Curated annotation (Swiss-Prot):
Transfers the 4'-phosphopantetheine moiety from coenzyme A to a Ser of acyl-carrier-protein. It is found in: Cytoplasm. This is Holo-[acyl-carrier-protein] synthase. One of its GO terms (cellular component) is cytoplasm. NCBIfam families: acpS, pantethn_trn. The keyword Coiled coil does not apply.
Amino acid sequence: MAVMGLGTDIIEIGRIEKQLTRSHRLAQRVLTATELAIFDEHSFPARYLAKRFAAKEAAVKALGIGIGNGISFQDVEVHNLPSGQPFLKFYAKFAQLCEQRNITSSHISISDEQHYAIATVILESP
């Protein structure tokens, strides 16, 4: 496998908490319907949203583009295996670009500590 892209993003969880006190618009913009359902029931919604935000930003950085260049936050979805290990699903324009670039697998690491959430994504081709 060849590494086709590497992206990392870090975000201050407090920034997300402030946004959520005003409105849930950021959550609706960043999260897919599946993720939003989990967010609505989550014990720590700001932490959940911050980790998803960082993961999606890391994914677009790994692809070498940014949100808004035909790519939406909705094009990347973060899931977890029963073990807790995260994995990504790609849709729409993001999936098309992966196919065009022969990207067939992704790896993600997400972590959070008191004030910050961070994610790193690696995209690979055969």
